[in-house]
Amino acid sequence: IEPLIRAGHTIFGENRVQEAHAKWPELRARYPEIELHLIGPLQRNKVSLALKVFDVIQTIDRLSLAKTVANHINKEKLKTKCFIQVNTGEEPQKSGVGPKDADAFISQCVFDLGLPVVGLMCIPPNDEEASLHFALLRQIADRNNLKELSMGMSADYSIAINFGATYVRIGSGIFGPRSDYHIT
């Protein structure tokens, strides 16, 4: 990670709250310009810890989580930004708000909860054309006046950029396949 930081890379994504909590505090003390994004699932019981570690939560995917995150952000006057995760493929095994429910969910998060939603995130199905899902996410973002789009990973990031991605997740393209890493 440090060679990338020294080369000028400042935005990093992490999938796991506890792993990030163990890894990043020392690095951030030395490199305060780092912006850290949670791009993996977030459990409500880890919200407090996540908000101490991350600048951006990209995986707001249900109302109970949105309420918990909003309560912490508002109570502690944090500057954390949030993305709504949209399950564009409506896959039952994946997290995210369904495309048909996205507008109402975004409105509820922003206007009822005061959640600082700045964008949307999606992970397209592996067996479908990614561009269809990126276009759908872009349409939802445009309807809701959201400027940030987190879409595209190592295999399809160039397509995502063509559809307006402002963040791409290319960890394995840079670091190689993820090895098992456990925090005890």
Language model segments and positions:
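C-terminal helical cap(s) of enzyme catalytic domains, especially alpha/beta-barrels
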Residues: 24-31, 158-184
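Conserved alpha/beta-domain cores
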Residues: 1-147, 153-155, 161-163
